[in-house]
Structures are given as C-alpha cells and as structure tokens.
C-alpha cells in the first residue's frame, strides 16, 4: 500500500498501533483499549461515572462528553506520537470500526483502508507463487 515508513492502526475493541520501516519490517507497536472499552472501564471501575453516551467536544463541559472526548484524544495522541517518533515522512494507515471517528480528530496525514487485514492477505497471496518459484519458503 505504501513504500514509506508506516504506522498501521487497527481501531476496534482494542486499538493496535504497529510500525513498519520503509522496507516493510515490523519495528514494534502498542496495544490500547479501544474507545468502547475505555468507556466501559470508567463506568465499571469508578464509583460514580456513567456509561457515557457523549459526543466529542474540543472543550467538553459535561461528564458524558468529557469521557467520549478523552477516549478519542487518548487514541489520537498515541497515534500521532507514533507517527512523529517514526519520522521520515511516515504514512498512517487506519482501519477498523472506530477508524473513521478517530481519523476525524487526527492532526496528521492519514489513509483509511477498509478491510486492511484482508487487503494484506490478498497481496501476500499474490506474492506466493513468485516466492515459491524462487525457492523462498517460510518453513
């Protein structure tokens, strides 16, 4: 999808932030609770916070909006830090159920790729005959 260094974000129940160098080598990554898990954790593990149904606000003034906004800010901040740390014109690829919502609040260039895992598998499958013909195997 890109030959640039890349931050790959899968935003679902958990949010994974993985980094690849320009040659496609995995450098490392992070796992965060997803947006819904963050909300549910606050509701279950605090004495008085509700299961928030708030909306994102730049400066929230009620508890529900503060919880919803805090989750988005945490996700966006972790993603943006990974892109800055990777440097060298890193590309950010977003996928998963919360990708659109998080993407709206990122201050970095990004590309949304629906079904990123399937896209990657298809690309790998397309490379398999060439890899086997040249004698490369993963065993």
Sequence positions of predicted segments:
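Phosphate-binding/catalytic loop of phosphoryl-transfer enzymes
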Residues: 1-45, 72-83, 136
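Conserved, helical-rich catalytic subdomain that frames metal- and/or nucleotide-binding sites
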Residues: 46, 50-54, 61-62
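Adenine-nucleotide phosphate-binding core of ATP-dependent small-molecule kinases
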Residues: 56-91, 98-101, 109-110
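Conserved phosphate-binding/catalytic loops in two-lobed NTP-binding clefts
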Residues: 107-122
């Amino acid at each position: 999808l890109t030959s640039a260094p890349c931050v790959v974000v899968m935003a679902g129940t958990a949010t994974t932030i993985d980094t690849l160098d320009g040659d496609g080598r995995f450098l490392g990554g992070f796992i965060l609770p997803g947006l819904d898990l963050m909300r549910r954790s606050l509701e279950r593990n605090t004495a008085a916070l509700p299961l928030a149904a708030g909306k994102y606000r730049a400066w929230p003034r009620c508890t529900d909006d503060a919880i919803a906004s805090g989750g988005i800010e945490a996700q966006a901040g972790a993603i943006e830090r990974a892109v800055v740390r990777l440097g060298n014109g890193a590309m950010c690829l977003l996928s998963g159920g919360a990708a659109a919502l998080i993407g709206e609040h990122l201050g970095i260039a990004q590309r949304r790729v629906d079904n990123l895992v399937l896209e990657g598998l298809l690309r790998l499958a397309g490379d398999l005959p060439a890899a086997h013909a040249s004698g490369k195997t993963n065993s």
